[in-house]
Curated annotation (Swiss-Prot):
Family label: Belongs to the FGAMS family.
Residue numbers binding Mg(2+) 1: E93, N531
This protein's name: Phosphoribosylformylglycinamidine synthase subunit PurL
Pfam families named among the record's database cross-references: AIRS, AIRS_C, FGAR-AT_linker
Endpoints of the signal sequence: none
Binding-site list for Mg(2+) 2: D117, D268
Active site (catalytic residues): H49, H95
Reactions catalysed: N(2)-formyl-N(1)-(5-phospho-beta-D-ribosyl)glycinamide + L-glutamine + ATP + H2O = 2-formamido-N(1)-(5-O-phospho-beta-D-ribosyl)acetamidine + L-glutamate + ADP + phosphate + H(+)
Annotated positions binding ATP: Y52, K91, D493, G530
Record: residues binding substrate: S94, H95, N96, H97, R116, Q240, E312, S313, Q314, S533
Organism: Rhodopseudomonas palustris (strain BisB5)
Amino acid sequence: MSAPEPKITPELVASHGLKPDEYQRILDLIGREPSFTELGIFSAMWNEHCSYKSSRIHLRGLPTKAPWVLQGPGENAGVIDIGDNQAVVFKMESHNHPSYIEPYQGATTGVGGILRDVFTMGARPIACLNALSFGAPEHPKTRHLVSGVVAGVGGYGNSFGVPTVGGQTRFHTRYDGNILVNAMAVGLADADKIFLAAASGVGMPIVYLGSKTGRDGMGGATMASAEFGEGSEEKRPTVQVGDPFAEKLLLEACLEIMANDCVIAIQDMGAAGLTCSAVEMGAKGDLGVDLDLDAVPTRETGMTAYEMMLSESQERMLMVLKPEKEKEAEAIFRKWGLDFAVVGYTTPTKRFVVKHGGKAMADLPIKELGDEAPLYDRPWVESPKLPVIHAREVNAPNSIADALEKLLATPDLCSKRWVWEQYDHVIGGNTLQRPGGDAAVVRVQDGPKGLALTVDVTPRYCEADPFEGGKQAVAEAWRNITAVGGKPLAITDNLNFGNPERPEIMGQFVGCLKGIAEACIAFDFPVVSGNVSLYNETSGRGILPTPSIGGVGLLDDFTKSATLAFKAEGEAILLIGETHGWLGQSVYLRDICGREEGAPPPVDLACEKRHGDVVRGMIHAGTATAVHDLSDGGLLVALAEMALAGSIGASLEAPPDGIVPHAWWFGEDQGRYLVTVKEDDLLTVLSKMKSVGVSCEQIGRTAGHTLKIEGERALDLKALRHAHEHWLPDYMGGKN
C-alpha cells in the first residue's frame, strides 16, 4: 500500500516552486485539489528547467533550419547531416546548481546526462566539451569548487570512455555564489537511424531500463529553477549520484536494442526523472500513458509514488517497445546486467495515470503537463548603452613586454593545462587536435572526415552590451571552427542568466538572443539544440549573462587542417582583419588597469564571414602554415600563444603610425586572424587579399626563441611559458 499523502496547503504549494496563480491554474485545469503526487508532477513539469516558461517565446526567434539539419530543437539533441548517411548528434546542457552544492557529483551527473541525451538518439558519443565558470580565485570556496568539478568531469568521461577534447574555464567574482558547469556531448549516428521521443500506437509496452530508482536527486529540477539563498548547502540531497560504468552498459545495451529494431520511442530520465520522460513521450505522440509504479525497480524500501515519480537517479531510460520484440529486448538488457521492467502502456486517453499499490495516485491531462505548460512574456528593459572608451583614455603600461608577461599569468588567460590534463582527451584514438587550440578536431572513423568542435562566450561583453555579446559568442565559435579549417554547420546553446522576474535580467536574455539569432542567420549557422538555465543568483546577486555557444563544423579532409603552432622559422606573420585598438571591456583594461568599463567591440558580421571564408580557403589550399583567431587579450597574447605552441619565437614590427601601442597589441577588435605563410607564398597571398578586399598586413616573422617587439625588450619563451603555465597549478596547490 502507498503511504498516506500530506494535506495540500499554501506553504506546501510554495515549497514546490509554484506561484499562487499557477496553483489556481492547476485547480481550474483539473477541477479539484491535486493529490500530493500530482502536485509534485505539476511542480516538476511546470518549473523553469523543464517548461522553459520564461524563455520559449524568445527562443522562437532563433534560426533552426538548414538543408543539413535533420532534427532541430525539441528532441533530446540536435542532428545534422554530414553526408554518406552519417549524422552528428549534439547538445549542451547545464548542471549549475548541483555542481555548486556538491561539485564532484554535480559535474559527473552533468556529463552523464548530456551523454544520455546523445545516445538516446541512436548515436555513439565520440567527444565531450565543457564551459566552466568559477568565482574569484580569492573567494574561499573557489579552489574547492574547481577541484571537485574538474575531477567530476574527468572522472565520468574517463570512466565512460569518451574523450573530453575542449572547452573554456573562467573566473569572475559574479560567479562566487553560482558557478556554471555547461557540458556538451557529440556523437555519430546513421542518418537514417535516428530515434525520437514521441510514442506511437495504443497499447504499446513502456519499459523501464537501466539502474534502479532511489531517493537521490529528489526535486533537482525544481531546485534548478530557483535562485539560491542562505542555506543552499542543505540542498545536497537533491544532487544526483552518477555511475559512469552503469552508463557505459546502458549505452551498449541501448545501441544493441536499437540495432535490433525493437524501439518505437525512447527518452532518457533526466530532470524530473520518470515524470518528465513519460509525459514527454506521451504528449509528443498525442497519447496517454498509464504507469504502474509497483513494477519500477527500486533500490530503497518503502518509496512512495511521489518519490518514485520525482527521483532523478541516474543511468535510466524509458522506452516504448514493439510488442513482438519484448523478449528479445529483455534478453539484451539482462545480458548487460541492467534492469528491464514493463512499467506501463500507451493509451488513447491523452491522460497521465499513475498507480501505486493498486491505487490511482495521479490522473492528469498529459498535453497540459507537457506541451501546454504555462508561458510567460515577462517584462524586460533594454540594457543601457555604455560609452566607447578611446585608447588614449586608457593608461599605457610601463612596458608592453611586462604587460604581456602579467596577462599570460592571469586567471582567464593562463594555460588551462592543469584542467585538461585531468581529462582523457585521446581515448578512442580519434582526437586529431587536442585541447589548447582554437577548436578540437575529432576524426570521423572509417574515412577522411573530421569534426571541428568548440565552446565559446565572452560574458563581460554580454553584460556590457547583450546584443553585441550574443553576436560575438556565435562569431567566435564560427572563427574557432574556421581557424582549424572546418566549415561551420550548426550550434547548440546553453543560456545561463539570473532571475528572469527582474526586467533588467530578462532584457539581457532578450538582447543576447537577438544577437545570437542575427549572427546565426548571417553565417547560415543554425541552432539545433540547447538549454536555458535561469535563476543563477544567490541572495539577489546574479551571474554575468553567459550564453555559451557550442559549435560543430566539418572538415571533408582532416589532413587539410591548421593548428595555432608556429611551424618553422623564417615564415611571414600576417594579421588579417582591421585593428582599431578597441580596449573597452578588454582583458588589458580589466587586469592591467583595474577597470571593467565601456562598450565591448562591435561585431561586423559581413566582415567576419568574408575574413573567415578567405582564411579557410588558405588552409584548404595549403598556404597557411599556422592559424589563430584573435580574442581575449588581443594581438600580442595570440602571438605568444602561437609561439609557445610551436616553441618558435618571433620578431615583430612596431605598431603603425596613428595607433596607440598598447591598443594595437592588446585591443580586442573582432573578426581577426593571425596566419603564417612561407616566404615563397607571401606576395601571392598579399595580392589575393587585396583583390578580395580583405585587410591583411605583415607584422613580423617567426624567428629564434624569443618574442622581440621593435623598441621593447625581448621576451624569452621559457620565461613566458613559466608565466603562462604556472598560475593555475600554483593556485590549486595553494601557492598563490
